[in-house]
Design a protein with these regions (language model features):
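The first (N-terminal) embedded transmembrane alpha-helix
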Residues: 18-37, 109, 238-246
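Interfacial/gating helices of multi-pass transporter permease domains
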Residues: 37-54, 58, 253-267
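Transmembrane helical segments that form the transport core of multi-pass membrane transport proteins
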Residues: 231-295
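Membrane-interface helix-loop-helix junctions at boundaries between adjacent transmembrane segments
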Residues: 129, 133, 138-146, 151-181, ...
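Structural signature of hydrophobic alpha-helical transmembrane segments
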Residues: 135-147, 197-209, 336-337, 344-345
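Juxtamembrane helix-loop transition segments at the membrane interface in multi-pass membrane proteins
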Residues: 67-86, 150-171, 257-261, 280-298, ...
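Helix-loop-helix junctions within the multi-pass membrane cores of secondary transporters/permeases
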Residues: 69-121, 273, 277-330
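Transmembrane helix-bundle signature of multi-pass membrane transporters/permeases
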Residues: 20, 24, 51-63, 100, ...
Length: 393
């Protein structure tokens, strides 16, 4: 075994470590998202529902963006979509319509379940339903209206320059969407509490929702639209439920966030890196399963073990950076941040293997299930462990 491991180490070198070190560098952009929230933390912590909804928005937007990025990349490589925003193929418009419809539907459900949780926490306030739903819908609508064109432009440019969109789209866009969601969410929760702001945001939601429903009316009967919605909706609904538990965990330590505000600076970067650690493993595994290079079993081969250790060490370096940033901003218990990753990584690895094997054996689309479920579970686990450790200290 040791001889085989030495041979693999000699053949592979530190390739995965270097690749993941570069890939995870995009997660540093999550610090910008965290800084946006940190600068208006008093507004963010003013209501339990605001704290609760934020992780759901981050998780939901990331998963929808991840699925869109994966499908766009695959379709570009297969020639089903042209690298142009104008006069593209019908499949592009069907994919565009399906993603927007699902985003609208899930943002409505997000606001609804957060409102129901708010009833349990502080009691029934009927007027709050409109504010929570409007906040959820507008955050998704506004961020989607920017994120989708940016995703398309980045995918088209990279494809034209013979750079594989599969390699760069998801890591870059996951960070971009975190920043977009954090900025949009912060602006919305400030503006929605004023009459003029409420009317303006309500108008944006009505116009955008009407446009999405018109697209659905035009393309909703297409086989590709129905198939995409059916396949994507199930894992995203599960992601939404798990994201809700993340929100509950974070809202339960609201007082600790007030005591240690610097945690919010690094929080988006923490869950991004945990998620991308799992996504890296999941992407490699799903590709090898699809190509028949590995057998569907839970145990790790020596090659998988060697690659996982490299990616784990790469992610650990970033967690040390996050701990140092939190320390510079007044958080003394820096070990909490590092332990979050160390404790969560074995469970994330197990979840990646289990979900990939389960989806593969049922002959389902790996892109639609493995990455969304893995990133959602990673977000939840990172948030849960961070909340638990904050509750203890």
């Amino acid at each position: 075994m040791l001889e085989n491991l030495r041979y693999i180490a000699k053949e592979e070198g530190l390739r995965r470590f270097k690749e993941s070190l570069i890939a995870y560098s995009a997660d540093l952009g999550g610090l910008i998202a965290g800084l946006i929230v940190f600068l208006r933390l008093e507004v963010f912590l003013s209501e339990p529902w605001i704290v609760m909804l934020y992780p759901i928005m981050i998780t939901l937007r990331g998963n929808i963006g991840g699925i869109f990025s994966a499908k766009l990349s695959t379709s570009l490589n297969l020639g089903y979509i042209r690298p142009s925003l104008r006069r593209n193929t019908p499949l592009f418009m069907i994919l565009f319509s399906a993603i927007n419809f699902i985003s609208l539907l899930l943002s409505f459900f997000s606001g609804l379940i957060v409102f129901l949780a708010q009833i349990v926490i502080v009691g029934f306030k009927p007027w709050l339903l409109g504010i929570v739903l409007l906040t959820s819908l507008s955050t998704q609508v506004i961020s989607m209206s920017i994120a989708i064109p940016v995703t398309c432009a980045l995918g088209f440019i990279s494809f034209k320059r013979k750079i594989d969109p599969d390699v760069i789209l998801y890591p870059i866009m996951s960070t971009v969407t975190d920043i977009l969601v954090s900025l949009t969410y912060t602006v919305v929760i400030i503006v929605v509490k004023t009459l003029i702001g409420f009317i303006a945001i309500f108008s944006i939601c009505i116009v955008s929702s009407s446009a999405i429903l018109l697209l659905m009316k035009k393309y909703g009967r297409e086989v590709e639209f129905v198939t995409s919605v059916k396949q994507i909706l199930a894992p995203l609904l599960l992601s939404l439920l798990i994201g809700w538990f993340s929100g509950l965990a974070l809202s339960n330590v609201k007082s600790k966030l007030e005591e240690y505000p610097s945690i919010m600076i690094v929080y988006p970067a923490i869950i991004d890196t945990i998620g991308n650690f799992g996504a890296s493993i999941g992407s490699i595994l799903t590709a090898r399963l699809a190509e028949g290079l590995v057998s569907p079993k839970l145990s790790l081969s020596l090659l998988e073990l060697y690659e996982t250790i490299q990616m784990w060490l790469s992610a650990l370096l970033y967690f040390i950076v996050y701990a140092y940033i939190a320390f510079l901003n007044g958080f003394q218990n820096v070990g909490v941040i590092i332990i979050c990753f160390i404790a969560s990584s074995p469970l994330i690895l197990f979840t990646c293997k289990l979900s990939a094997i389960g989806v593969f054996e049922r002959n389902l689309d790996l892109d639609n299930f493995v990455i969304p479920l893995e990133t959602t579970f990673s977000d939840f686990l990172g948030t849960l462990l961070l909340s638990l450790f904050l509750g203890i200290i």
